[in-house]
Amino acid sequence: MTKLAQWMFEQYVKDLNLKNRGSPSFRKWLTLQPSLLRYSGVMRANAFDILKYGYPMQQSGYTVATLEIHFKNIRSSFANIYWNRDSEEPEYVCCCATYQSHDGEYRYRFVWYQPFIEAYNAIEAALDPLETIILNLIAARDLDFVVHIFPYNKGHEDYLASTQLILKIFIATLLMDILRIKDNTLDVHLNSDYIIVMERLWPHIKDAIEHFFEAHKDLLGYLIAFRNGGNFAGSLRPSCGQKIVPLTIREALQMNDINLAVWREVFIMQECSDLVINGIAPCFPIFNTWTYLQGINQIFFENTSLQEKFKKDFIARELSKEIIKGQKTLNDKEFKKLSLHQIQYMESFLLMSDVAIMITTEYVGYTLQSLPGIISRSSYLSPIVKNILMDEDSFMSLLFDLCYGAYVLHKKENVIHADLHLNNMTYYHFNPTSFTDRNKPGKYTLKVKNPVIAFITGPKVETETYVFKHIDGFGCIIDFSRAIMGPNHAIKLERQYGLAFVNTFYRNQSEHILKVLRFYFPEMLTNRENEIQGVILSNFNFFFNSITAIDFYAIARNLRSMLSLDYLHTSEVKRNVEISQTFLDTCQFLEEKAVEFLFKNLHTVLSGKPVEKTAGDVLLPIVFKKFLYPNIPKNILRSFTVIDVYNYNNIKRYSGKAIQTFPPWAQTKEILTHAEGRTFEDIFPRGELVFKKAYAENNHLDKILQRIREQLANENL
């Protein structure tokens, strides 16, 4: 172990605050060993460093190209390329088709361009037959690549035309996705048009692809660069993902205004990321940064819901023109002026700007919508992963991860997710304790005996510690675009925006809460909707804790739905995966208890009494009782190897929002002190200057905002 790694481990363990907590035997049992560093939360700390120093981005100033393939009357985008200002060579590429989503377009495999192109060039000779096939299809006009550049840049267009970069990126994307198809690990919500393109293209490329995978197994390690940004076979480097959301004029102008959904999501993502780096919970992606992309229009997006946004934009513009045309007959100048101002203000919430926000975060694995198919069909997953759907302790570990994530979200962040469907929950296969041999499917090596993860969930420490089998990763919660902000945020909002804003914010949110309740519990609102809305508005302090049950109900209901999928109970699948009835019963029990908590406490609130506890306070000890440390026999505890610990009692001392609030293990001065003579560039090849520029004051962003303000002011003149 290097001196730097040893120091990071010691610093991370120190910040877990495990000393002098509980009995001597408990403290001894809970001790983390340095030899187990690579399986512990230290690796998430390492992921934070890699994301922050390996993927820095300024908050504006990028040109983006979206690459499309057109083949046999089907078109799909398959990648993005990013240039920083007027530099000729790209800075980043994202070789992935988009995922189907409502609020934005998500892709993973967002990587630094330099290691990407170096890795491709290293294996290009072996890919020559595949390149020739694609070029012949282009020459025959059966296949075409189409490029859209935002904002348009002739130099970048010429660069792409004079190189074979588009072809290389397409082949890299294709290789990664065909590898996932071979492994049966392709996500079910990948863009369906892209999947059709692959299916139609397959007869043409089948022989060349299969020859590459069979004859060049020694080169497969280079493919890591297309996913993780470094050609390190077996590397634990995190994958980075991007989410791009088109912004209305108001969203583009009012940065960090949490009354607007996109900025509310950014705020919650940053707060939840801080839960990870402070050793409180592993259940969320690490937030990297956001940047504005200019010149964006509906051509950039593929998802139907985003196309609808641009249709509404067109309708709103036409309506406002008609209204203003009618105004010209009015004589009252003051009324006319006021009306125009009101129209412009309302327009700003409906009209789309030409700006989109790109958010980059740690990619946290397969969604639970995809997980059953992956586990039941893939021959490359270790038994530890497969046991998630077959072994009670493994399944309960995944279930607890998700429930604990909801618990800390409610208690630490005063936020309810409110949209925990199967594509907003993931299994993150990270820091595994078992390793498979790609050349020998089904063979694996276990590196740690009986690995477990401990969660300290309250101030009583020892009696509130849960112990679960480590499942080569953990469950994660993503996408906070429909989240409910609790009453604790009112003081901060009032300080920033004033009391009138706070009242408007919570009044608007009450409609969203009713919509969520209507979706999950329609019978609850029968003849009581006005009464419930009145309580939300007048006594949200009491009401919030009662509706934290929504997230637990959604987790249980959707996991039960996942386990009940018809194909999981076919004879073919049951040969590989046998779903236990116990899993279904546990989910139903949690579901029932969540409903019981909600209805009981709603009655309490309506009678004017406070609800002191959140759903997690009540449900965790009931559902996971057997996994509490005091309830596990001592001989069983002694057989466990503790490889990770998370401590709810920790405060959020550190934050990823600004350099000065980074943890010590992410501070450049501290890192170099323990680097044994290595330079910053030796550790983080992007270099310190690139990182500092990303956090410097950005005049270019100010110019974008000024242009949008002028656009809004001149819109109706």
Curated annotation (Swiss-Prot):
Principal localisation: virion
Superkingdom in the source lineage: Viruses
Record's note on what induces expression: Expressed in the late phase of the viral replicative cycle.
GO cellular component, one term: virion component
Alphabetical list of InterPro entries matching this protein: Kinase-like_dom_sf
Cellular location(s): Virion
Keywords, sorted A to Z: Late protein, Virion
Entry's family note: Belongs to the asfivirus C717R family.
Descriptive protein name: Uncharacterized protein C717R
The species this protein was found in: African swine fever virus (isolate Tick/South Africa/Pretoriuskop Pr4/1996)
